[in-house]
Each structure stands twice: as structure tokens, then as C-alpha cells.
């Protein structure tokens, strides 16, 4: 009986962990710019310390929202341009290229691996950045 109770408690606690939720393209509104999120290659999401899931339409909006928010962040997510799946923002490699327009016009796309980013760089000249470099770049939608 005690073992069953411990298992049930563990299951309940794991259900409380909040990660990103799938972005509903064509329905969700960007938490930063309020535009409807349309392009599944560029979405992003912040999960606040309180578990609020804040969808964004681009990496640029995510950067601005995080910089302006007074809420603590639990996790940050960006969409891998290749697979269209949410990946951790801190581990992604970013391509900044004027040849690959993003929803807010800054030309930033995210990739799960350096190899994928380098493949995109061959098609869309620009520069590759990691999360720290991207945050320090001063990129903004303003």
C-alpha cells in the first residue's frame, strides 16, 4: 500500500512539471507583438517560473519579451527551422540572414544542431550565433 502511494505521489508531481505546449499556428497570438502566430518554422515559447506558457511568433519577439519581462523564466524554447519542433533556446544554433526573412523581419532562424545551421548558411548567407551571442547582439523587433 505504501509503495502504491509513493508511485501515485511521484506521478502527480511529474504531472506538475510544466514545459512548452505545442503552438497552435493560425490561432495563438504572440505574447510580445500580439500578431497571430502563422509560420511553423519560426515560433518560440517562454515558460515562466509560475508555469505560464507564453507563445511567440519569432525568436526576435522571444528576445524582446524576455528582456522586458519581470517574470522569472523556467525555460525558453524556439522552433527548429528544419523539423518544426520546439527545442531549448539555450542549445540552439541561430542563423541571422537577410536572405531568410522571419516573421518580424530580423532574419533569425533556429536549428537543433550546428550541422543543420551550417547547411542553412550555405543557402542563406549570414552569420551563426549561439544563444549567448544572440542575446548580446542587440537584436530587437523595435
Region annotations inferred by a language model:
Residues 2-9:
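Sec-dependent signal peptide recognition
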Residues 12-15:
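C-terminal motif of bacterial Sec signal peptides marking the signal peptidase cleavage site
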Residues 17-19:
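Bacterial signal peptide processing site
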Residues 26:
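Short metal-coordination and nucleic-acid-contact micro-motifs, chiefly zinc-binding Cys/His arrays
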Residues 74-142:
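Thiol/selenol-based redox catalytic cores and closely related redox-interacting motifs
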Amino acid at each position: 500500500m505504501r509503495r502504491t502511494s509513493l508511485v501515485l505521489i511521484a506521478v502527480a508531481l511529474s504531472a506538475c512539471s510544466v514545459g512548452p505546449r505545442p503552438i497552435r499556428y493560425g490561432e495563438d497570438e504572440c505574447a510580445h507583438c500580439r500578431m497571430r502566430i502563422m509560420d511553423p518554422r519560426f515560433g518560440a515559447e517562454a515558460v515562466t517560473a509560475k508555469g505560464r506558457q507564453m507563445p511567440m511568433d519569432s525568436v526576435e519577439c522571444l528576445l524582446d519579451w524576455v528582456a522586458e519581462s519581470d517574470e522569472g523564466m523556467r525555460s525558453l524554447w524556439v522552433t527548429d527551422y528544419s523539423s518544426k519542433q520546439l527545442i531549448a533556446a539555450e542549445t540552439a544554433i541561430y542563423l541571422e540572414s537577410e536572405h531568410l526573412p522571419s516573421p518580424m523581419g530580423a532574419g533569425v532562424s533556429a536549428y537543433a544542431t550546428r550541422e543543420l545551421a551550417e547547411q542553412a548558411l550555405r543557402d542563406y548567407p549570414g552569420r551563426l550565433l549561439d544563444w549567448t551571442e544572440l542575446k548580446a547582439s542587440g537584436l530587437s523587433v523595435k
